[in-house]
Curated annotation (Swiss-Prot):
Its EC number is 3.4.11.1, 3.4.11.10. It catalyses: Release of an N-terminal amino acid, Xaa-|-Yaa-, in which Xaa is preferably Leu, but may be other amino acids including Pro although not Arg or Lys, and Yaa may be Pro. Amino acid amides and methyl esters are also readily hydrolyzed, but rates on arylamides are exceedingly low; Release of an N-terminal amino acid, preferentially leucine, but not glutamic or aspartic acids. This is Probable cytosol aminopeptidase. GO terms for molecular function: manganese ion binding; metalloaminopeptidase activity. The active site is at K267, R343. Its cofactor is Mn(2+). The gene is pepA. It comes from Synechococcus sp. (strain CC9605). Mn(2+) 1 binds at D260, D339, E341. InterPro entries: Leucine_aapep/pepB, Macro_dom-like, Peptidase_M17_C, Peptidase_M17_leu_NH2_pept, Peptidase_M17_N. HAMAP family: Cytosol_peptidase_M17. Disulfide bonds: none annotated. Binds 2 manganese ions per subunit.
Length: 489
């Protein structure tokens, strides 16, 4: 999508759709100005009882020349217009422009944000909310959407805000496509192929470990999960190396269960087995982030992406409840629940990631229903052994408009993972389940390595769509990871 600034005012701008944001208290003055060009707009606003409140919206088709469509958006009180409200208004403008091609002109008051930030927020919102996945339809619906966004009445400094938008959004869209695709399409091999495509297109390094390679490295936890599937597991390591000196090295680890039946602890009832295609949402996020990072080429930061991908299925070879397996570090794990498989795959993935000697490791996983119960479907949970890393990720999430909330890593809860026979069990008691899951993962992180775990089970999917996310896969995590990596360059 093309982004630019327009120096034209509301009287002069000539594009296809003009969207104007009005705060409460400014409606009459702005309506009077619009009346000079769009006769009858004042009466239309009164008839609609448009007050400028958040959610107020009027769409009209002006007579005569000029824009095909005029969109007036309520923004609420001026002092309450923050970045989240700007993002929402830009998304509403884009949705109101569907059906028109050409350019969308957008004027929003950005007093509470600097011009560069406002430009980035609006551009990301417009592109992301216009996304629609029609890959699996025989006859895709014809769509007419704006091809360009022009921001009106912003200072020239705002231009730099567009720099990373298309690359970041392309990563989000890749993640959405991977999560949304059915499990007969996105398999472990397909994830490896996606990584290969990114490596080829952007000059990254790629290593894919096959089952025999994983056996040689002693990845018994990962391989135990995979043994019930006819599809071979793939352990994927994608590397971005910057030109020049490497000042920071980070690892992004994503859970890559392309389908999770639950194993012998089969998912039933409310477990929504039909939606378990999205159990690879963590791998989608890190692959999407790597696609964006590879295009943006941040200086000084080396990025390692690690995904242990397989299916969790049921057959005569599948792991049993009660089996004891050994991770690559020699730690033994009693599997008291085969449906807590993601942490087993992540155990060996985290150990491998730490072998790369990173300054920080961040893992993303659709790990627990407990996190969804605690935080709902708009927030991910964050656990970390390092305050600086947690704060940096929180800032990156806020910049990207992705909900993230730090959760306690309470050590006393680790007692719930004690096993009579093995070093630990893979699940603890139901209360505090997302915390014990994080404590389990922590056991596989090198002692002095900064680490964060982000449970994205809630926001990975949106049933109805909201804000910049259409219904379906959200691509959650890509913007947070990209912003975090860029902040270190």
């Amino acid at each position: 999508m093309r982004f630019s600034l327009s120096s034209a005012d509301l009287q002069e701008w000539n594009g296809d759709v003009l969207a104007v944001g009005l705060p409460q208290g400014d409606v009459d003055a702005t309506a009077t100005a619009l009346e000079q060009r769009f006769a009858g707009i004042t009466d239309a606003l009164k008839q609609q009882e448009f007050k400028g409140k958040p959610g107020d919206q009027l769409v009209i088709t002006p007579l005569g020349g000029g824009p095909q469509r005029l969109v007036v958006l309520g923004l609420g009180e001026s002092d309450a217009i923050d970045t989240e409200r700007l993002r929402g208004a830009a998304a509403r403008a884009a949705k109101a422009a569907i059906g028109c091609e050409g350019s969308l002109g957008l004027q929003l008051p950005c007093a509470g944000s600097d011009a560069q930030e406002a430009a980035r927020i609006c551009a990301e919102a417009v592109r992301l909310c216009l996304y629609k996945d029609q890959r699996f339809r025989k006859e895709p619906d014809p769509r007419r959407i704006p091809e360009a966004l022009e921001l009106i009445d912003l200072s020239p400094a705002a231009e730099s805000g567009f720099a990373a938008v298309n690359a970041t959004c392309a990563g989000v869209e890749l993640a959405r496509e991977l999560v949304a695709a059915p499990p007969n399409v996105v398999t472990p091999a397909a994830l490896a192929d996606t990584a290969a495509g990114i490596a080829k297109d952007h000059g990254l390094e790629l290593k894919v470990l096959e089952r025999s390679d994983c056996e040689a490295k002693g990845m018994g936890a990962f391989l135990a999960v995979s043994q019930g599937s006819d599809l071979p597991p793939k352990f994927i390591h994608l590397i971005y190396r910057p030109e020049g000196e490497v000042k920071r090295r980070v690892a992004l680890v994503g859970k890559g269960l392309t389908f999770d039946s639950g194993g012998y602890n089969l998912k039933v009832g409310a477990a929504q087995i039909d939606m378990m295609k999205f159990d690879m949402g963590g791998s989608a996020a890190v692959l999407g982030a790597m696609r964006s990072i590879a295009e943006l080429k941040p200086a000084g930061v080396e990025v390692h992406m690690v995904v242990a991908s397989c299916e969790n299925m049921v057959n005569g070879s599948a792991v049993h409840p009660g089996d004891i397996v050994m991770a690559a570090n020699g730690m033994t794990i009693e599997i008291n629940n085969t449906d807590a498989e993601g942490r087993l795959t992540l155990a060996d993935a985290l150990l491998y990631a730490c072998e790369q000697k990173p300054d920080a490791v961040v893992d993303l996983a659709t790990l627990t229903g407990a996190c969804v119960i605690a935080l709902g479907d708009e927030m991910a949970g964050l656990w970390s052994n390092n305050d600086d890393l947690a704060e940096a990720l929180d800032a990156a999430a806020q910049t990207g408009g992705e909900g993230l909330w730090r959760m306690p890593l309470r050590q006393s809860y680790k007692d719930g993972l004690k096993s009579l026979l093995a070093d630990m069990k893979n699940t603890g008691p139901r209360p505090g389940g997302s915390i014990t899951a994080a404590l389990f993962l922590k056991e596989f992180v090198a002692k002095d390595t900064a680490w964060a775990h982000i449970d994205i089970a809630g926001p990975v999917w949106s049933d109805k769509g909201k804000g910049v996310n259409p219904a379906g896969a959200t691509g959650y995590g890509v913007r947070t990871l990209v912003n975090w990596v860029l902040a270190q360059s």
